[in-house]
Amino acid sequence: RYGSDKPERRFGCEIVELTSHFADSGFGVFKRAVKDGGVVRAINAKGFAGISTGQIKRLEEVAKEAGAGGLAYIQVRGATKDTWRSPIVKFFSEEELASIEKDLNIEEGDLILFGCDTRATVCDVLGRLRLECAEMNNWLEGKEDELDFHWVVDFPLLGYDEEEGKWNAVHHPFTRPKAGQEELLADESKWGEIRAEAYDVVLNGNELGGGSVRIHEGDLQSKMFSVL
């Protein structure tokens, strides 16, 4: 929802899942991403359609720094779709446009920012764009004294390293899988689904601390080591 494991929740602009709409899209970039097992997601920066050229360039820089190939966006200049301004909107079908409009709750004046790649890359890209838009629009103005404490849980137990071609422990190799998921360690196709008994406490986008429940059984620890 926020593209970060230490989310800033004092403003909205949550990440929206759009992958299912673009499996057979006329926009090749999105279609290829879905075919390759990636995702297509977006955020709606409310009221930011009047963004300047300089600000667009800055958002593009942020996206590329996070691993994106570029910046795909739509400026919603008016109440009808013929007022949507974007280098990519001409490739979308009417059905795709209607789905985007509904899922993102698009209104006149909005700016839509897309991400398409692996899940991890898209989360990072849109998470950073979300924070950059907040800074550009002063979305936290008047909220400086708000204290949004929350727990972040259900972290993945394992993460796949594309460069090294192997699985690693996201937290550490002694972290316990969620109850009932221990047997999934025997099935490599399920490793990405396993959640960890780990948790962080976050305040206003800053991690204050965290921890985990450890593995105490020798056989379970051996299974974990065999994965790594």
Regions found by a protein language model. Give the residues of each.
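Class II aminoacyl-tRNA synthetase catalytic cores and aaRS-like
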Residues: 1-228
